[in-house]
From Swiss-Prot:
Monomer. Belongs to the metallo-beta-lactamase superfamily. Glyoxalase II family. The lineage of its organism: Bacteria, Pseudomonadati, Pseudomonadota, Gammaproteobacteria, Enterobacterales. This is Hydroxyacylglutathione hydrolase. It comes from the Bacteria. It comes from Yersinia pestis (strain Pestoides F). Binds 2 Zn(2+) ions per subunit. Keywords: Hydrolase, Metal-binding, Zinc.
Length: 251
């Protein structure tokens, strides 16, 4: 499989996953122009569009893409029904597109109907889980978002996180501010600074590594709890998550 990240807007990524026959899926096309350019350059043949949630920077290019490819199915959660989705999918549903199997995972939090698409090893998770971070709570509750990222964290180690924004460096700066002595975070921040200075993407990233450098996946870490002056018992880890999210919102 060939995975391509297509930059869009200021910091979005539209994902394209193609097989050997150059049949591909397009994930969260916020705008159409860069997608059409990539399709033409690589001679890819789109088989489907996958939407994770209803925000315009993820669905804005759907109408024009459907103009160019009238028969293309557009999969998405119920909240995308008015944003171009032609096939509504729900948690636990399975899709087979261009010979690749996809499982739908409900991940409410950023929006109430947000979903992710998992096709081993690829995880298209929209604005739920970012490298070294997670999405803002624009509609859901902290409990929902914490449960969602924990659900994604249970996927296999080799899972490749294909999120929709280039937020890695800013997320690492926040993580370093919380855990300045953490060598994994400090080293990775330096690596990403060099990568981004060359305008190269920081994604995708393996879930196994993400568990080390993403503070939102480390809410049970005693050192982390001490740093944010939280002494939550194991059944209150959502309060640790909530405190981290609150601090990140104002960072």
């Amino acid at each position: 499989m060939n995975l391509i990240s297509i930059p869009a807007f200021q910091d979005n990524y539209i994902w394209l996953l193609a097989n050997r026959q150059k049949h591909c899926v397009i994930v969260d096309p916020g705008e159409s122009a860069p997608v059409l350019a990539t399709l033409a350059q690589g001679q890819y043949v789109p088989q489907a569009i996958l939407l994770t949630h209803h925000h315009n920077d993820h669905v804005g290019g759907v109408a024009d893409l459907r103009h160019h490819f009238p028969d293309i199915p557009v999969y998405g959660p119920q909240e995308t029904a008015k944003k171009g989705a032609t096939v509504i999918v729900n948690d636990g549903d399975s899709l087979t597109i261009a010979g690749q199997n996809y499982t739908i995972i409900a991940v409410p939090g950023h929006t109430l109907g947000h979903i992710a698409y998992y096709s081993s090893p690829y995880l298209f998770c929209g604005d739920t889980l970012f490298s070294a971070g997670c999405g803002r709570l624009l509609e859901g509750t902290p409990e929902q978002m914490y449960a969602s990222i924990q659900r994604l964290a249970q996927l296999p180690d080799e899972t490749l996180i294909c999120c929709a924004h280039e937020y890695t460096l800013s997320n690492l700066k926040f993580a370093h501010a919380i855990l300045p002595a953490d060598q994994d975070i400090a080293t990775y921040q330096q690596q990403i600074e060099q990568l981004r200075s060359k305008n190269l993407p920081s994604l995708p990233v393996k879930l196994q590594f993400e568990r080390k450098i993403n503070v939102f996946l480390r809410c049970n870490d005693i050192d982390l709890q001490r740093k944010i002056e939280t002494t939550s018992p194991p059944d209150s880890l959502v309060s640790v998550f909530c405190e981290l999210r609150s601090r990140k919102d104002s960072f």
